[in-house]
């Protein structure tokens, strides 16, 4: 059976990230790269559970502050911990110009992104990290699983996300010392 991330109905993760940023801006919700990563991950997980297929193509990895989509991370990493005002771009193969990646039009995707923003969009980056680190959740199973030797940088496959996503429903508390200036960095 092929991996779920190869589903032809999944969408360019940059397009979904741009949609999330556009909808967040319309709701006056500022989003940092760290928050974007977590919200995109939560939307992807909900989509896997609710629709039985992945929301975005590619994969998430277990990084220090939770799940990260490396392609989306690279698009917005120049922002550091600041709020994102730009959009993901791509190179048009016909013109050679760099253009903004168009958000998807699929109504299910729009509704899924809106639901995540309305339920989690105003949470701090630290709170989103705490939820993504839930015991028994996908990130925890990969990053802290037996034999992983601190599995940071390991892929979190869609099967693990779908099977373990129910553990993401936890009460949110911010560990002492975590502020909203957290910045993710690739595992070394």
Swiss-Prot record:
Keywords: Toxin-antitoxin system. The keyword rRNA-binding does not apply. Induction: Induced by DNA damaging agent mitomycin C, part of the socA-socB operon. InterPro entries: SocA_Panacea. The keyword DNA repair does not apply. Pfam families: SocA_Panacea. Disruption phenotype: Essential, it cannot be deleted unless the downstream gene for cognate toxin socB is also deleted. In depletion experiments the half-life of SocB is 19 minutes in the absence of SocA and about 2 minutes in its presence. Disulfide bonds: none annotated. Interacts with cognate toxin SocB and with ClpX. Antitoxin component of an atypical type II toxin-antitoxin (TA) system. Unlike most type II TA systems, neutralizes the toxic activity of cognate toxin SocB by acting as an adapter to promote its degradation by ClpXP; degradation is dependent on the N-terminus of ClpX. This is Antitoxin SocA.
């Amino acid at each position: 059976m092929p991996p779920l991330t190869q589903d032809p109905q999944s969408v360019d993760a940059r397009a979904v990230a741009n949609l999330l940023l556009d909808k967040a801006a319309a709701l006056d919700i500022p989003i940092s790269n760290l928050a974007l990563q977590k919200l995109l991950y939560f939307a992807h997980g909900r989509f896997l559970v609710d629709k039985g297929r992945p929301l975005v193509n590619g994969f998430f990895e277990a990084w220090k502050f939770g799940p990260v989509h490396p392609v989306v991370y690279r698009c917005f990493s120049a922002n550091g911990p600041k709020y994102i005002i730009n959009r993901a771009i791509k190179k048009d193969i016909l013109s050679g110009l760099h253009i903004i990646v168009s958000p998807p039009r699929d109504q299910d995707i729009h509704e899924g992104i809106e639901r995540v923003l309305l339920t989690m969009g105003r949470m701090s980056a630290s709170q989103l990290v705490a939820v993504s680190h839930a015991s028994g959740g996908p990130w925890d199973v990969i990053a802290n699983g037996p034999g992983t030797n601190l599995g940071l940088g390991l892929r979190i496959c869609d099967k693990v996300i779908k099977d373990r996503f129910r553990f993401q429903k936890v009460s949110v508390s911010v560990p002492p010392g975590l502020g909203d200036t957290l910045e993710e960095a690739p595992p070394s």
